[in-house]
Amino acid sequence: LTAEYEMDGGYIRTKDFKESVKYNHEPMFSLIDEDEDYSNNFNLIHSMNSSIAADYLKLIYTDTICCNTDRHTDNYGFLRNPDTGEIVSLSPNYDNNIALISNGPLGLPNENDAFIELFVVFLKNNITAKEMFKSLNIQPLSKQEIEECIQHVPIKIGYDIADIILSR
């Protein structure tokens, strides 16, 4: 599943991704409370399902390159089969309104960036996560790919987001 967004007046909001599916959304908060530690979250998810743990790595990597400062345990979760209780996937990525453009242009340099440091330290200290992340073989985005995505954003962006993302 992919989160879909729509304009709501002057705002962008996430469409309800549970409406047309047969699964319940369960926030990570229900499993780990307010513990936002990447390693603790990854280890718990990995103990349940390694494929979903890989999706979690992609989620926090995306947060890192897009400066999403609002990834707490109520802002991501799982789709659960209500009949069996099985967790079937990570919920679509949602609630990204704090990322990149919400607070104006981002400052550079990135060598002191807390998000990059948190992600790097997490991978350095969690060997399972590090090996899994390597196996994902995530390729860098090109400026053209980023600009193509930006063309689909229905708001005016007053500075070069592509350069900011590429600098990270």
Residue ranges and their predicted role:
Residues 1-68, 72-73, 77-168:
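Anionic ligand-binding catalytic core segments
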